[in-house]
Amino acid sequence: MTLNDRHRGKLFSIGMKMAEVPDADHRLLGVIRRLGLNFGFGEKTVGEVCEEAGVNPHTLLLISKIYAYDGYVPSAEELSRSSMRDILTYLHNSHDFYIDIALEALDKAIHAMMNTCDEKHYKILMRFYGGYRDEILKHFEYEEKTVFPYVRAIDGGKTTEGYGIEQYEENHSDVDEKLNDLKNIVMKYLPQDCDNNLIQKLSLIHI
């Protein structure tokens, strides 16, 4: 997203007030929680809050920039200063969030929409949504059981065989394609009397 005028040109920093971080992008409230940081930080800085929680502050800044700056690509230096342990914690907690909250909300939106759709459109949507949901859950399981242990091993200086990160990239692209297919079905083919708010809910889901 484009930063608002207050944050245009303003860099995230360890010395800034933690309460100011979500001003750049409201989604950073979720980032803060999924890194294991509790609210109620008052006037404390990013560095102070992270130190108290045992979280690498550079990791928070890195993820915040990815959310707040369009097309942001972190430098090698930024990546080296961040904690892989904290990044994996964030990703694991994100899985819990999507399964327990985001997908549950999407389930309810899908079924609420069915009340106004005919049988033909019901079958079309459910086929694509069912495929997307299954793909997401399989993807999360794949990350938890295969990708995260691989990354932990590499981060710990261990060598691994039989798996490469390029395999992860291919798997992740399949998930994105499923979501795009579902969005296209909703936008192009569902009648106007169906719930138009569904596409907005779909737009909030990004893995």
Label the model's feature ranges:
Residues M1-I205:
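Small-residue-biased structural context
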